């Protein structure tokens, strides 16, 4: 019935992002309509009852692709021989919490998860990290899982890309399908770099349609950078459904790529074509090669505005890295 079966782990299984994401996963949005799924849903001890409710809903959804659904509070059981992991669970930033405090708390979580991945997951497993601060959490997990391939760790910048994509399409009054090569560099934070200089509308440079450089630099860029905070202020909660959709799209770009598609992802900077420091997780434009492997899109020019923003984002990533210990 199935062309293959993949074993998939999802952490933070009782949270809102996972709740939205799991149904897209079960529907086949990521691995396709012919791939069976052996699903393991993890959350911390004390969440057993909520986990059982999530499993009930997946059972009630009668998803043909779900060959097995296991809920667990054991990381080893969740990660055992998996092909892919979606690391969603993390400690949210609370009132009065400094970023360094958040880095410390989540650093411990992702160090533990990295160690278990290292012993339990398949060497070729792809790891998608969502929990914030996502670049540094991804870097911590990667460095605690040296048996796994470093190139297969991804920090999610797709939500930032989607936000930028939507804003550009609305401003240009064109369908989303008309906008391509939407690129977000750097850190998933308020210092990310939404790079409009690479974007195309109907295959032409964006400035031919949106000539207002002031809007691009001083309205669009900061709006994308601060969109997460704006959602929290308006909704009272952080992004969930849009984050889940972005995660599904990020993974689908790898498992079911469209020819020529660019996608933004936080990946290991080792041997990157832009001369950035190695051993960090940095947002780059990527594309699939048709072999199941991706490459960082090389040779893109940076004007003075983008170059300045890039340095700010790089400095933040390096500061975060220096503030945590492995």
Swiss-Prot record:
Reactions that this protein is recorded to catalyse: (S)-malate + NAD(+) = oxaloacetate + NADH + H(+)
Keyword DNA-binding appears in the UniProt entry: no
Keywords noted in UniProt: NAD, Oxidoreductase, Tricarboxylic acid cycle
Top-level taxon of the source organism: Bacteria
Binding site for NAD(+): 12-18, 106, 113, 130-132
Residues annotated as binding substrate: 93, 99, 132, 163
Enzyme class: oxidoreductase
One Pfam entry name: Ldh_1_N
GO terms of molecular function: L-malate dehydrogenase (NAD+) activity
EC number: 1.1.1.37
GO biological process terms, semicolon-separated: malate metabolic process; tricarboxylic acid cycle
Active-site residue numbers: 188 (proton acceptor)
HAMAP family (alphabetical): Malate_dehydrog_2
Family: Belongs to the LDH/MDH superfamily. MDH type 2 family.
Functional note: Catalyzes the reversible oxidation of malate to oxaloacetate.
PANTHER family reported for this sequence: MALATE DEHYDROGENASE (PTHR23382)
Protein name: Malate dehydrogenase
Gene label: mdh
């Amino acid at each position: 019935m199935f062309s293959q079966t993949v074993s998939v782990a999802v952490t933070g299984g009782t949270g809102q992002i996972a709740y939205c994401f799991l149904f897209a996963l079960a529907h086949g949005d990521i691995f396709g309509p012919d791939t069976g799924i052996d699903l393991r849903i993890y959350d911390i001890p004390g969440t057993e009852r909520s986990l059982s409710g999530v499993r009930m809903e997946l059972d009630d959804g009668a998803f043909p692709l779900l060959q097995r659904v296991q809920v667990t509070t054991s990381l080893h059981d969740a990660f055992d021989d998996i092909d892919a992991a979606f690391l969603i669970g993390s400690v949210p930033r609370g009132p009065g919490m400094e970023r360094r405090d958040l880095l410390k708390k989540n650093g411990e979580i992702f160090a533990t998860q990295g160690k278990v991945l290292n012993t339990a997951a398949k060497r070729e497993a792809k790891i998608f990290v969502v929990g914030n601060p996502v670049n540094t959490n991804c870097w911590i997990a990667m460095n605690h899982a040296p048996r796994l391939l470093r190139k297969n760790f991804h920090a999610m910048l797709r939500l930032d890309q989607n936000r930028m994509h939507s804003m550009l399409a609305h401003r240009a009054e064109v369908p989303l399908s008309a906008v391509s090569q939407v690129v977000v560099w750097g850190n998933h934070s308020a210092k990310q770099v939404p790079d409009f200089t690479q974007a195309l509308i109907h295959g032409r440079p964006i400035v031919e349609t949106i000539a207002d450089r002031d809007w691009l630099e001083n309205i669009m860029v900061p709006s994308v950078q601060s969109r997460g905070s704006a959602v929290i202020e308006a909704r009272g909660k952080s992004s969930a459904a849009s984050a889940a959709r972005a995660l599904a799209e990020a993974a689908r770009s790898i498992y079911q790529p469209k020819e020529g598609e660019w996608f933004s992802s936080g990946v290991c900077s080792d041997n990157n074509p832009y001369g950035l420091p190695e051993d960090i997780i940095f947002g780059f434009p990527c594309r699939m090669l048709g072999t199941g492997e991706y490459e960082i899109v090389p040779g893109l020019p940076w004007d003075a505005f983008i170059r300045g923003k890039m340095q700010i984002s790089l400095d933040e990533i390096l500061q975060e890295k220096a503030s945590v210990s492995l």
